[in-house]
C-alpha cells in the first residue's frame, strides 16, 4: 500500500488520479501506523514551509518520517520539507537530506515563481531515470529550490541551476509536479513505485 500523506487539506486530485492510472493501491492518510506500514510513502505539498512543518508536527509525523526505511518521495514543497532548512519563513525542516531551500533569483526573463515546463538534466544513473533522458520536460511551480549539489540526481536551469531530483538513502525529492508532467511524470512515479521497499 502507498501512503499519500494528507495533512493540510491540499487538492490531491491530480496525484491520486495518476496513482489510479498506474494501478497503485493507495490511501490518503495522516495516521502514523498506516504510514509506517506502507510500502512507499509520498509527501506532497502546496503552501509554505511553515504551514507544511506545522501540519506535520500537529499530526505527530515528524519523528515518524525521520525513521522510515521504505522509499519516501517528497513532491514540490514536500521535497523542500525533506531538507535541513527553508529560507521561506526561516524554519528548520525534517533534515533528511542536507541542504537549504533558497529563494530563486528573479531576472528579467526569469520571473519568480518559476512556473511552467522545463527539462531535466540527469547527473547520476538512477532507477528513477529508467526510460527517460535529458530531452524530457516536467512541470514546475515554485519559488524556492535546493542548489545543485552532490545529492542531485537531476538538475534544471532557470537562470541558474538548481536540484530537480534529489536522493539520499531511501529519501527522494522532486521539485516539480510529476502528477502534472504528462507521460514523463507517469514514468517517474511508476519508477518510484517500482523501488524495492525494505519496510
Swiss-Prot record:
Transmembrane segments: none
Pathway named in the protein's UniProt entry: Amino-acid biosynthesis; L-histidine biosynthesis; L-histidine from 5-phospho-alpha-D-ribose 1-diphosphate: step 5/9
Enzyme active site: 76, 177, 179
Amino-acid biosynthesis in keyword set: yes
Keywords of this entry: Amino-acid biosynthesis, Cytoplasm, Glutamine amidotransferase, Histidine biosynthesis, Hydrolase, Lyase
Any one cellular-component term (Gene Ontology): cytoplasm
Subcellular location: Cytoplasm
InterPro entries in the cross-refs: Class_I_gatase-like (IPR029062), GATASE (IPR017926), Imidazole-glycPsynth_HisH (IPR010139)
Recorded superkingdom: Bacteria
GO BP field: L-histidine biosynthetic process
Enzyme Commission number(s) from the entry: 4.3.2.10, 3.5.1.2
Protein name: Imidazole glycerol phosphate synthase subunit HisH 2
Upper lineage: Bacteria, Pseudomonadati, Pseudomonadota, Gammaproteobacteria, Legionellales
